Design a protein with these regions (language model features):
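Bacterial Sec-dependent N-terminal signal peptides
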Residues: 1-21
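Glycan-recognition and catalytic cores of secretory/periplasmic carbohydrate-active enzymes
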Residues: 20-138
Length: 138
């Protein structure tokens, strides 16, 4: 009798769980969200200041160098000059894109366009459509 009750309880609980509506996920544009004064806004502002403090010419140096163009500044060290050159540049473009979508900050927009214009210049110099900062990638 006890086993039958347990089985019945299990069947009822699982069927009730299945009867509930599954949560619906939908995407929305980042610009539809505005952060209020909070730790989240402070974190966003910290990130904004950090990405604008980076020197875009140093992040572009590997791409320009591989394209046969003269860089405007030396590469950053560590990841950017030991075989993964240009790696951070891709993350940087993503960060700028998301920050602009979230804030509409014109300095971020201008920095993003500068990065894209310079990468396009490197791409044109290579002539194959490829853009690469890793040594020997072309």
């Amino acid at each position: 009798m006890k086993a039958t009750s347990l089985i019945l309880a299990f069947i009822l609980s699982t069927s009730l769980a299945k009867a509930q509506n599954a949560p619906q996920v939908s995407y929305f544009p980042l610009q539809n969200v505005k952060l209020l004064d909070s730790p989240f806004l402070q974190a966003q502002q910290t990130d904004l200041h950090y990405i604008l403090a980076l020197n875009p010419d140093r992040l572009l140096a590997p791409f320009l160098r591989e394209a046969g163009l003269t860089p405007k500044a030396p590469s950053y060290t560590n990841w950017e000059n030991t075989g993964l050159d240009g790696h951070i540049g891709g993350h940087y473009i993503s960060a700028l894109s998301m920050m602009y979508a979230a804030t509409g900050d014109t300095a971020v927009y201008n920095r993003l366009n500068y990065m894209l214009d310079e990468l396009h210049r490197a791409q044109q110099a290579v002539g194959t459509g490829f853009i690469g900062g890793t040594p020997g990638s072309l």
